[in-house]
Curated annotation (Swiss-Prot):
Keywords assigned: Membrane, Transmembrane, Transmembrane helix
Top-level taxonomic group: Eukaryota
Compartments it resides in: Membrane
Originating organism: Saccharomyces cerevisiae (strain ATCC 204508 / S288c)
Cytoplasmic face residues: 1-19, 73-104, 163-199, 257-275, 322-327
Protein's name according to its UniProt entry: Uncharacterized membrane protein YNR062C
Segments crossing the lipid bilayer: 20-40, 52-72, 105-125, 142-162, 200-220, 236-256, 276-296, 301-321
Cellular component per GO, a single term: membrane
Bilayer topology term: Multi-pass membrane protein
Cited Gene3D superfamilies: MFS general substrate transporter like domains (1.20.1250.20)
Record topology, Extracellular segments: 41-51, 126-141, 221-235, 297-300
């Protein structure tokens, strides 16, 4: 199997995994919808729609953790000096040629950005739909479930969009592959280039899709603020913006890890995996802090989502550079 085919299959499998995870995340909103009907008291403490889904989710997570403790086995791990191992891996990462290092840093920033975008949607969804539109928890659950299902189509269609570009490249090189065996290496290089260009283009396209979704969210907020649209219509408009933003997020989250794997040695990537995961996780930790501070200003939601749009916009030129300056 060629390297291009192998990478294409891995990219497709990762996208399928993301699509499945997104669908289960969307279906999890059924818990929110079901427990949104709760309204009773336990020794004076009221369990209602605003806290019942949280309690239910906590107990489900606890049950899953206990199940994993019973089912999973703890494999034997070879004892190594993890500090030296991580330190040497970091030194090896930063000692690569300058252009490759810049490319890796651009992709790491894109991973951070994708998690920031996701947190932006999750943060503002309850704020806007509860405080401004006055939707009940169950209606918010329905809105987020629909937005998640529509957004997760990004993971489903990502490999198909990549395959369109790759199939065009294969059609052009088909004659060479059949007529000249010595040209197989050239064909393989062209396939890899086609796969790479397609994934970078998908990443750039994802950022533009995210910009469109964020613009919808700001538009819904401003329309409600100036009473240009009824609250229910504003809520639907805002949910449409969430769907589009999540679509861009899933496109980006499908393509960026695959691109990063092209720039880094597989063994080095395994050693740095905790650090790479931490960079993505930082986006989810930073987003609520930054967005809450901006939301507290006079412009509120508009300036907070606008800040996210600025981050997305400034990330487009580096990806364009990445497409032109492949290492």
């Amino acid at each position: 199997m060629s390297i291009a085919q192998d990478r294409g299959i891995v990219f497709k499998l990762l996208s399928i995994y993301r699509a499945a995870a997104g669908i289960f995340m969307a279906l999890a909103q059924l818990i929110v919808i079901f427990f949104g009907y709760c309204d009773f008291k336990i020794k004076g403490y009221r369990i209602a729609s605003y806290n019942a889904p949280t309690f239910a989710s906590s107990f489900i997570i606890l049950a899953v953790c206990l199940l994993l403790v019973v089912v999973l086995e703890n494999p034997e791990v070879k004892v190594t000096n993890s500090e030296n191992s991580l330190f040497s891996a970091l030194k090896q990462f930063f000692r690569v040629e300058r252009k490759k290092l810049i490319s890796c840093l651009i992709l790491l920033w894109s991973m951070f950005l994708s998690s920031f975008i996701m947190s932006e949607v999750v943060y503002f969804m309850p704020l806007f739909l509860t405080l401004h539109v006055n939707w009940d928890t169950k209606f918010q659950g329905i809105a987020f479930m629909v937005a998640s299902i529509l957004g997760v189509t990004g993971s489903y269609f990502a490999p198909k969009l990549i395959n369109v570009g790759c199939s065009c490249g294969r059609a052009k090189d088909g004659g060479l592959e059949e007529s000249d065996t010595t040209g197989s290496e050239t064909v393989e290089v062209k396939k890899k280039d086609s796969l790479y260009s397609g994934q970078v283009f998908l990443s750039i396209f994802a950022l533009f899709v995210s910009l469109l979704g964020q613009a919808f969210m700001i538009g819904a907020s401003e329309a409600l603020k100036h009473k240009s649209m009824p609250p229910t219509n504003s809520g639907i408009f805002f949910s449409a913006g969430m769907s589009i933003t999540l679509l861009g997020y899933n496109f980006l989250a499908s393509s960026i890890p695959a691109l990063f794997s092209m720039y880094i040695d597989p063994k080095l990537k395994v050693q740095l995996m905790p650090s790479i995961g931490a960079i993505s996780g930082i986006g989810k930790l930073v987003a609520p802090i930054v967005l809450a501070a901006l939301y507290g200003t006079r412009l509120g939601l508009s300036i907070a989502v606008g800040f996210g749009m600025i981050l997305v916009a400034v990330s487009i030129p580096p990806l364009i550079w990445l497409r032109k300056k492949r290492c």
